[in-house]
Amino acid sequence: MDLGKDQSLSKLHQTPDHHQEESHVPEVIGTWSLRNREQLRKRKAEAQEKQTSQWQYREKKHKRQRTGKRSERGRKRQQNTEMKVELPSQLEKEMMEKAPAPGEKEIEPPGSVTEVLLPAVSPQRVAPAKHLSEVGQESVTLQENSSEYQATAVQNQPSEICQDMAESEDLSPKMCQEIAIFQDQPFKMFRNMAQPEDVSPKTCQEDIAAKVLSSKTSEDTTDLEECSLEAHPKPDMPKASTLETYQKRPEPEEPDSETGQGIVETESFVSNTQQEMAVPKELATEIHQETVEPEHFSHKIYREIAMSKDPSHKTTQETSVPDKYPPEMYQETPGSEEYSLEIYQETTGPEAYAPEIYQETPGPEDLSTKTYKDKDVPKECFPKLYQEIGGPQDQDSKAHQEDAKDVYTFPQEMKENPKAEEPEIIEIPNVPQESNPENDIYSYVLF
């Protein structure tokens, strides 16, 4: 019975086990297999879809980028071609429009070139060239003028005149014309016209007239007056005096340096004029060594006497320029020989001169005679002195030999003497005028 029970139990145990095994195993296997297959299929399909979608999407992107690049390149090419086509068309249009304008411009430059060249050739057209609106053209013309002046000055004159001619750019156009004319002329003519710069054209003409009149009066006067003119050149007429002295002197040792000093005189009045006047001053000192030192007139008296020498009042006001020069020059230049009464008796007359000038002259004439009386010097000593020395030309020849050595060794006593003698001149008018017999002559001439 136990066996039966055991078998039945075993069968029962076995059967459910078999069922459980069969049911469990296929269920598990079946489910897993199905799931796996389905999942695999789904996954494959999804993967393929993704791949296809991604591939399509990538292809679309690539296509879009390629088409965009191609479009941009195509647009650029089209724009470049259009610009190339438009540029020549626009250039042609502009050239066609501007065709008359360049013709006018081509016609204008020759005129401007001639306007620039003509001032260099003919100095008469310097003024319109300078009045142009552009400052550059003015500077070019000025530089050309300065270069021409410097070149001609180096060829014709010493280095001192080059510096003076370099400063001629600031002159008026009329004076530039005159300087150009002087450059074209030979060197002798330029020496004769040594100082054309600071003198206006009107004063130049009047100086020439004054020189002609002075030459006529010098022929009438005695050797005394010639010596006085040579020994004491007037500062108001430097041209005439310097030219006469240069022509009469036989030894032209230093003409270039003297002409250079004459031109430099217009710029530096005090220093160079003292050097230039040193030669006649030394002659005057040699003449007056035997006599007392000459009188030194004051500035006003010297101006009035210079006015009496000139032919008319207007020429003296225009030619003589005493305001520019300091009063030291007038005090240094000895004027005793020039203004002696014997010369006035021979040269002056009531017909040749205006009465207004004579009203100014008697003051300095009386002063000259009274100063000689105060110093106890006779009036007749002047011709004796010139006779003893041997004439004015001998003095000039002797003095010229000593000029090269003693031009710059002028004694300082002559500069100090005018200051010491000025109070004497103030006291002179108190002396009575009746003692001089020659003053009666001049009072008669005045009235």
Curated annotation (Swiss-Prot):
Modification Phosphoserine occurs at: 89, 122, 200
One term under GO cellular component: nucleoplasm
Record keywords: Developmental protein, Differentiation, Nucleus, Phosphoprotein
InterPro entries given in the database record: Hemogen (IPR033272)
Annotated spans, Disordered: 1-91, 137-156, 210-280, 306-337
Positions with biased composition (Basic residues): 59-78
Subcellular location: Nucleus
Superkingdom assignment: Eukaryota
Annotated Basic and acidic residues bias: 14-25, 35-49, 306-316
UniProt function note: Regulates the proliferation and differentiation of hematopoietic cells. Overexpression block the TPA-induced megakaryocytic differentiation in the K562 cell model. May also prevent cell apoptosis through the activation of the nuclear factor-kappa B (NF-kB).
Protein name: Hemogen
Species in which this protein is naturally found: Bos taurus
